[in-house]
Every structure is written in C-alpha cells, then in structure tokens.
C-alpha cells in the first residue's frame, strides 16, 4: 500500500503526534487493559498498532511469557515500532505488516485484543471485527476506543476555526471511506459476531488551556491542517490559521473533547 493512503499520513510529525496522543490517553488505556484482565502471560492482538506505543505497553504488561501480535499495514510505522521494541528490550512483540480488513489474524489464540481509532478509517469495519472475534479464545476480551460523537469537540464559546477544522476532518474521513462516529455501531456489530458486551463507558473531558489533554486536539490541528493542505482540502493560508487556532485561544479557555466510547466485549 502507499503511505499516502493514510488520511493523516505516516511522516515523522505524525509519529510524534501519535506519541503525544498516547501519553495523554495512557492512564485510561492502562485502566482499560486492567479491567479487561490483561496480565502476565497473556496473548494480545493490537489491531492497527501504528508506531507501537500501545503495543510496547502491552508487551511490558504481559511480560516474557506473553505475546503481542501487532498488526499494521504501514511499513513506516512498523519500522518505528520495531526500533522502539529493540530500544526497550522487548522481544515478545511480533510486528506483522497486514491490512486488518483483507486478512484474518488467526483462530482462537488470543486472550485479548486492543483497537483504538481504527474502525473509523478502514473500508470494512464489520469484517475487521469478524477477524477480531475469530482470533479470540473462548472467554477472551476485546477492548475498543472509538469515536461516538465527534461533534462534541467544541470550545467554550465556539471558535469558528475549530468548527471549520472539525467539519473538514469529517469530510476527509468520509471521502476516504471512513465514518467518524463508528462507535455508535460497534456494540451491535460485536453482538452479531457472538461477543457479549461486558462494559461500555463514555470517555469525554472538559479541559482548560494549559491542561495536558488540551495538547491532544491542539497537536492534531497543527499536523492535520498541513495534511489537509497537502491533500488539497484547504489553501496554505487557511491551513496556517487552522494549525494555530487552539494556541491562539485566550488563557483560561475551556474545551470539550470528542466523545469516545470504551467498549469491552467477551467471547
């Protein structure tokens, strides 16, 4: 596949942004892993592993007796993942270059799976979920973080440039065959694949400028605006304004983050 097929790109700036994003969300991710029962000796599939920030966390959790199968179609991201694993001394990660729609992952070998902000982008999310269900052992658990209402992302009061960027995000994802609010369909799809819903949690935050989580959408706007210009959605001048919109908000400003659903299901 071409690295250009990624709506958000696979360049160094995107790797850096994904690292920041993972650091912001890491406490909630680790809590989800704990509640899903992921522990030493487990076999876990990371579906759409990207540069491997969650995969390396999982590898440390499951330990030498466990295994992490990191599935990712971008060779660029896998190179970053493998280098990170070497640097951390983690020999229990198998990094596999694979389109998570086109090929299955294996049958009945995984104690758990992890998937974050992937289903919004893939051509056939139902098929991907079928692969997840097939890979799990009986009793295995699937953990997902997916958007359920992207339009909750608002500044207080609303900022026209943030609103404009949000609409462009939805358009670019839609044009590439994706759906922003894929989390709304997720519980029904999992049930149809024979999985039992264990827990659904809403993950949404109201933060002030200067809060660590503020950096998550701010960094997305900075890199995403440039990517939109590269793809021809905006002119360079508008991209520059959109990139710094959250940085230019007054001190003490408030923001609501996009609504993410955490779904844990059991086979």
Question: Which residues fall in each region the model found?
Answer:
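Conserved Class I S-adenosyl-L-methionine
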Residues: 180-181, 191, 198-267
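Class I SAM-dependent methyltransferase Rossmann-like catalytic core
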Residues: 3-25
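Conserved alpha-helix/loop element of class I SAM-dependent methyltransferases that forms part
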Residues: 23-42, 57
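A short glycine-rich, Lys/Arg-flanked "PGG" loop and its adjoining helix->strand segment in the class I
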Residues: 126-141
């Amino acid at each position: 596949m071409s690295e250009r097929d990624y709506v958000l790109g696979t360049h160094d700036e995107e790797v850096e942004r994904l690292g920041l994003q993972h650091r912001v969300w890491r406490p909630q991710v680790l809590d989800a892993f704990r509640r899903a029962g992921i522990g030493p000796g487990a076999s876990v599939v990371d579906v759409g592993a990207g540069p491997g920030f969650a995969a390396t966390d999982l590898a440390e959790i499951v330990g030498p007796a466990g295994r992490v199968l990191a599935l990712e179609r971008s060779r660029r991201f896998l190179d970053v993942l493998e280098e990170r694993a070497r640097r951390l001394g983690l020999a229990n990660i198998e990094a596999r270059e694979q389109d998570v729609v086109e090929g299955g992952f294996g049958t009945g070998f995984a104690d758990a799976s992890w998937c974050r902000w992937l289903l919004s982008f893939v051509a056939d999310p139902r098929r991907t979920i079928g692969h997840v269900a097939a890979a799990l052992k009986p009793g295995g658990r699937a953990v997902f973080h997916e958007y359920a209402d992207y339009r909750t992302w608002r500044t207080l009061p609303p900022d026209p440039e943030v609103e404009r960027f949000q609409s462009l995000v939805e358009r670019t994802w839609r044009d590439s065959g994706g759906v922003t609010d894929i989390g709304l369909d997720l519980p029904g799809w999992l049930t149809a694949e024979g999985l039992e819903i264990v827990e659904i949690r809403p993950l949404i935050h109201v933060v002030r400028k200067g809060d660590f989580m503020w950096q998550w959408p701010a960094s997305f706007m900075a890199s995403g605006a440039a990517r939109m210009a590269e793809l021809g959605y905006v002119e360079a001048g508008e991209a520059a304004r959109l990139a710094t919109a959250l940085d230019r908000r007054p001190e003490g400003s408030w923001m609501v983050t996009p609504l993410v659903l955490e779904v844990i299901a059991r086979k």
